[in-house]
Amino acid sequence: MTDLLNYSHLAFPKTPLRIGITGGIGSGKSYVCAKIAQRGYPVFYCDDEAKHIIRTSSFVHDRLTALIGPDVYDDAGQLQKPVLAAYICSSKQHAAEVDSIVHPCVAERFLHWCEAQTAPVVFMECALLYESHFNALVNLSGYLRIAEGWNISFTSGYDSPSIRKAMRFFNGLKYYSSSKDGHRV
């Protein structure tokens, strides 16, 4: 399994300033990042990139098939989301195994994306900024917090059992905002 803490093999761009945005489900990450993008700043969406990589990368396809089995993709090569979700949700170890395949690919894509940007500041929206250790890829990070109860109203379009399961997971995590050197901001 790849050591998620070690991104030293990747070439970090000298510019632009990279700011990570994270927060719990329904905290407003997407809303804030949409407003940032409206102001002309580039925003990299980690979840979207991870989904794209899982669907299109032959490397990831081969690794997930070897890990989970041939049913994770159908005969046409299309991801079978229920199979992947069942595997990930069955244990923390399984989730970590999938993360060890996908997260390094997302990190590499983010750094290449940064190199192509001309803006002095770029943003990364990442629900799992600290858990994925992507906070090591940004200069500053910010955690969006919203009053308890409000976030559920923002996520009401999702399946309720899924929301409850996700909230139980995220409620067990601790967050803070920090600069890359670990000082709280």
PLM regions: where:
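Glycine-rich phosphate-binding loop of ATP-dependent small-molecule kinases
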Residues: 1-78
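Residue-level signal for inorganic ion chemistry
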Residues: 47, 98, 123
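ATP-dependent small-molecule kinase phosphotransfer cores
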Residues: 51-119
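Short loop/helix-cap segments at secondary-structure boundaries that form the rim of catalytic
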Residues: 36, 131-137, 176-182
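ATP-dependent NMP and nucleoside kinases share a basic, alpha-helical "lid"
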Residues: 108-116, 122-157
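P-loop/Walker A phosphate-binding loop and immediately adjacent motor/lid segment at beta-alpha junctions
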Residues: 96, 104, 108-115, 154-185
